[in-house]
Amino acid sequence: MKSNTKIATAIVASFVLGGGTVSVLHAQAKLPAYAFVEIDVKDQDGYTKDFLPKAQANIKEGGGKYIAGGFNKAISMSGSPPPTRVVLLQFPDMDMLKAFNVKQRQLEAELGSKYASFRGVAVEGVEQK
């Protein structure tokens, strides 16, 4: 009888500890981060041939991926009309997005500003329940 009690206690303890471990691991998981970028392209040919391949390489190297957007794919829901290019990017977490942004700002200043003006906003995702 005593050994059955010990086994039952061990089983209950393992469930309690296991559930606590899952909660801790879940709480430590980083949330994805998103970049919403508005681009007013002045020279689409130059932008597409010269700047865009380098920007796409930066996104990939930075761990990002395209979620939505492109040339003339956005519509205005209210307020001013959208610029010629709007892009939504996803990154594994805000730290990776920030690291990407440092490199991307440099590329935009050195090359992209010849062809377009940029406005970007970063936002952290929310936990899905």
What is the predicted function of each stretch?
Residues K54, K103-R105:
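Alpha-helix boundary/capping residues
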Residues M1-I11:
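Bacterial N-terminal signal peptides that target proteins for export
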Residues A10-G20:
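Bacterial N-terminal signal peptides
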Residues S113-K129:
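C-terminal end-helix/capping segment
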Residues R105-Y115:
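A common structural junction motif
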Residues G18-K98, E124-K129:
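Short S/T/G/P-rich N-terminal loop/turn motif that feeds into the first structured element of a domain
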